[in-house]
Amino acid sequence: MANKNVGTITQVLGAVVDVRFDGQLPAILSALHLEHQGKKLVLEVAQHLGESTVRTIAMDSTDGLTRGTEVVDTGAAIQMPVGPETLGRIINVIGEPIDERGPIGNKTTLPIHADAPEFVDQSTETEILVTGIKVIDLLAPYCKGGKIGLCGGAGVGKTVLIMELINNIAKAHGGYSVFAGVGERTREGNDLYHEMIESGVIKLDGPGSKVALVYGQMNEPPGARARVALSGLTVAEYFRDVEGQDVLFFVDNIFRFTQAGSEVSALLGRIPSAVGYQPTLATDMGALQERITSTKKGSITSVQAIYVPADDLTDPAPATSFAHLDATTVLNRQIAELGIYPAVDPLDSTSRVLDPRVVGNDHYQTARDVQRILQTYKSLQDIIAILGMDELSEEDKLVVSRARKIQRFLSQPFHVAEIFTGSPGKLVAIDDTIKGFKAIVAGEYDHLPEAAFYMVGGIDEVIEKAKKMAAEAA
């Protein structure tokens, strides 16, 4: 123990632990280790209090922790196992496996705190990432190496959409993915793991797994939830920087990262800012988001679920996230109530790459025409509610009819929801999506019933469904 820097615990306040060091004080963000109930407990230094005491945040429960316990300074930040050995495994915030399948066997570890790539190392190419989901590919397309946000209140389908994207992109993409479960339901994390095993994305009996899972779920203390996104990102950065891969990085949910940060901030006694959030909200978010970027070696495309408290998009937590995103997919409760899934709002969702120079004129024009029709329908809804459809002009009636068909055609059965809905999932090629919407806008399918457009894949299925409906009616 002679060369180790050892301190003793002087105070335990929930997740906050004060430690006194007689020798040198550990640096801020250093990891401290101690034995607690037969397990390793990690504390991260957050503040220096006076000459000999540090205030730390615990990464696990502090129940049963007593004053006087010895703590060892590691002299470095929390270290995360990285490399191909992490694929197919579930790891917690401090890099320990939690899937009961033995040690990870990694050869390399990296600290979870790192600088963002230098300005000169970043890549600026723009290319569309096809998801196979009609509403996204047409109206708010994702960009390779970009940041994508899925925003919505509770229970509108963020996690289902993220799981469908993992299913569609991770399988078609062939590269590696990293999933960071930040403060979400343990049940969903468990479901995701077993679904990945069933679909072959994770292989239990040998190499070939394509995804690493890093979990810090709702039941974890705030310290773990505030750091698990960084732990997951460290695994993804290794694949980008060392192996030159194009990595997919999924975060569910980025709001919980902010929420945990606000809990930690309050425990540390900082004065809160707007709506009770931490004063360092923008700094914390920037430190995470700036590391998620594409370099000349490889790229990280990140898909982040963003919980919107009380469906208020102006809340500081989602509003701070938006500043960093290339595309936002907004999920709307009113659309979910109509039974249209994915409940993506076609007018609120935005994308930086919906630009004729990136997607081409045909795609751009079709998307804008679809939005124009939907916007006109939205502005006519008050008149329809008060006076009824009969008071509209013939031209407006036609717009409403097409808008309702477009609205239904934006729905789509998902592979991951097959077990609930019983209808097989559909993956639609982007050319088919553009062709279908272009034809609806042009009025080529004005004669088909609205119901034929609901929960189908491409436009050919609409025609089939309409024939079937006509045959049944006859």
Swiss-Prot record:
Q: Which PROSITE patterns match?
A: ATPASE_ALPHA_BETA
Major location, coarse class? Answer: membrane
Q: How does it sit in the membrane?
A: Peripheral membrane protein
GO molecular function annotation: ATP binding; ATP hydrolysis activity; proton-transporting ATP synthase activity, rotational mechanism
Among Pfam families, the record links this protein to: ATP-synt_ab, ATP-synt_ab_N, ATP-synt_VA_C
Q: Does the keyword ATP-binding apply?
A: yes
HAMAP family on file? ATP_synth_beta_bact
Q: Which NCBIfam families match?
A: atpD
> What family is this protein classified in?
Belongs to the ATPase alpha/beta chains family.
Q: What is this protein called?
A: ATP synthase subunit beta
Q: Which organism is it from?
A: Paramagnetospirillum magneticum (strain ATCC 700264 / AMB-1) (Magnetospirillum magneticum)
Q: Which gene encodes it?
A: atpD
